[in-house]
Amino acid sequence: MTTNTYNGWTNRATWNTALWLTNDETLYRTMLEHFRDEEINNKNARFFCNLLWPCSETPDGDELADVNWNEITDMIRESVETDES
């Protein structure tokens, strides 16, 4: 049996994007602050990441075009909800 996932995420690009957004405290706090005032959806998640990484890839070179934005949006939503409780 083989799996087509990467560390529980759809692919490496999605995992790496989530890793960058959640493993750097300053970036994580910036993300939380941004999404307290913005609707959490795929378009806004991608826009936020493009602001962070204008070259359209993570600092590790993973293309944002390959990211599963549904998973990133869910992760952001869960992070914001957890922080508010």
Regions inferred by a protein language model and the residue ranges of each:
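Acidic interaction surfaces
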Residues: 1-85
